[in-house]
């Protein structure tokens, strides 16, 4: 795993390019190993099959060092959760402790995304060297609807159980009864506690794998060298982002959501210092629905966009954010205050932010702009998926059909697994022809997904771009809007809005047609 000879005593203030590459890849490798462990040991379809999880490594003050290429909206926001833990628990953090966090106002995204955070001490248990975090989307964490993705929540308590740096493991002892009490003592308790516990234990195992690998790295290279190169890795990422910024131009964009909310963004480039200011002044106030995006989500979307402009193979880390200055007014729906509902802000508004930023930079037409969040369940079953669509076109490239875009990178569950674990049939799943916007370079097509139910359940859809189409750029046409409907077992069609909850019966078919991406350039 490690080179046999390492210059433990040759630590300088200048990075050796060979060792810089070694450490960049080594940190990412450790995060990927954490992810493999999590996938192999998790119980839920959501984590094991859909891969809706992320793993990352942080330094002793909570700065992101490296991550595996998992879910962008997780990766850009987890540092805020780690820093919240450090600020909250501080001197009480002890060897063998592990914490749970999902508070959207302390670095969380939405309540189903629960982060397990482990402090990593040196082998003498004297000093914290790192923090490890694994974030997984729980198939159900309580709330007013099965699957914990309620389309019509207006208060954070309606979306599930909140963990605010909850002590999950104390000095190596798993606090199972305290966890069960926390999951059940709520107006809207969790529905599948055994699965929650199993997935949390899988996340603990993932962090333990990362701990072993980090200790091996320190043993091999020495702490001084490891510390030096974790900073070099961040410095290298910062330089790469500054280089990408140096060729950009000022821009602004106004982006409209189906619910009437508006994102206004102005990007100002400081060429002399290779910095960018991203100003969301003028954006709509906090909403009385759940499309409010926590500050950590907005930051993650900005970080994602600027990371995608970098051509070099760098890990996403704290260095990427140093050249970026954000202005996000408190109380707007991109920086809401408690107790705003946020479940769609993470999955839907994050997509809108990315589209708005690309629009301001003039780089890419809108992608589908939604994750098409589909949940169904009852007291026995709970399932959640995000459904792919079309990506936007840009100068010199066409969009891609049937792909997860921007802030999500999750899989769809294999039909065989889905049908084995749940009383449903995947009746069809196909590309939606001609849904991408036309242009010199056309946007990618969306998809059509039809799920047939064999048992009565509650089904929910939380989606966007059902009224306003994904925009084209430079003369390109907009992509097609999405569509939601239920085909009842008697053949009647019930059209649904972008956010809806319906009761489905055996033989009913839920139909989701996802948006296409916008085109770029005149035909």
What are the functions of these language-model segments?
Residues 2-95, 100-123, 128-277, 281-523:
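Glycine/proline-enriched, intrinsically flexible loops and inter-domain linkers
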């Amino acid at each position: 795993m490690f080179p046999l000879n390492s210059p433990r005593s040759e630590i300088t203030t200048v990075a050796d390019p060979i060792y810089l590459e070694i450490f960049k890849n080594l940190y990412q490798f450790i995060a990927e190993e954490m992810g493999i462990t999590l996938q192999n040991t998790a119980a839920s379809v959501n984590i094991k099959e859909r891969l809706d999880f992320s793993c990352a490594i942080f330094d002793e003050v909570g700065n992101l060092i490296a991550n595996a290429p998992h879910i962008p909206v997780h990766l850009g926001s987890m540092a805020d959760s780690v820093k919240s833990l450090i600020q909250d628990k501080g001197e009480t953090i002890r060897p063998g402790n592990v914490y749970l966090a999902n508070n959207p106002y302390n670095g969380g995204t939405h309540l189903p995304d629960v982060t397990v955070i482990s402090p990593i001490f040196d082998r003498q248990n004297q000093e914290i060297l790192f923090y490890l975090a694994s974030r997984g989307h729980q198939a159900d964490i309580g709330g007013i609807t099965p699957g914990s993705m309620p389309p019509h929540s207006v208060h954070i308590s309606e979306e599930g159980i909140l963990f605010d740096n909850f002590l999950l493991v104390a000095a190596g002892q798993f606090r199972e009864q305290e966890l069960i009490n926390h999951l059940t003592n709520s107006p809207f308790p969790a529905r599948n506690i055994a699965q929650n516990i199993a997935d949390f234990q899988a996340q603990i195992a993932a962090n333990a794998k990362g701990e072993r690998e980090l200790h091996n790295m320190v043993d091999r290279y020495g702490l001084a060298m490891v510390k030096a190169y974790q900073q070099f890795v961040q410095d290298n990422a910062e330089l790469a982002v500054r280089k990408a910024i140096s060729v950009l131009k000022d821009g602004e964009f106004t982006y409209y959501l189906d619910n009437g909310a508006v994102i206004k963004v102005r990007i100002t480039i400081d060429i002399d210092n290779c910095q960018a200011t991203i100003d969301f002044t003028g954006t709509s106030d906090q909403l009385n629905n759940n499309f409010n995006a926590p500050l950590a989500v907005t930051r993650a979307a900005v970080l994602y966009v600027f990371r995608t402009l970098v051509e070099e193979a760098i890990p996403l880390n704290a260095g990427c954010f140093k050249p970026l200055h954000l202005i996000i007014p408190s109380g707007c729906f991109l920086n809401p205050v408690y107790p705003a509902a946020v479940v769609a802000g993470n999955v839907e508004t994050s997509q809108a932010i990315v589209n708005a930023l690309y629009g301001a930079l003039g780089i890419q037409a809108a992608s589908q702009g939604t994750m098409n969040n589909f949940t169904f369940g009852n007291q026995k079953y709970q399932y959640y998926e995000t459904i792919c669509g079309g990506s936007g076109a840009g100068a010199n490239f066409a969009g891609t059909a049937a792909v997860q875009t921007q802030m999500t990178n999750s899989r769809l569950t294999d039909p065989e697994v889905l049908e084995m674990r749940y009383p449903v049939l995947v009746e069809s799943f196909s590309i939606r022809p001609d849904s991408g916007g036309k242009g010199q370079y056309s946007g990618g097509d969306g998809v059509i997904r039809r799920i047939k139910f064999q048992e009565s359940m509650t089904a929910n859809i939380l989606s966007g771009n059902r009224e306003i189409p994904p925009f084209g750029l430079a003369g390109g046409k907009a992509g097609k809007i999405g569509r939601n409907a239920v085909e009842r077992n008697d053949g009647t069609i019930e059209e649904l809005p972008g956010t809806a909850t319906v009761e489905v019966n055996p033989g009913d078919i839920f139909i989701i047609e996802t948006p296409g991406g916008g085109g770029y350039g005149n035909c």
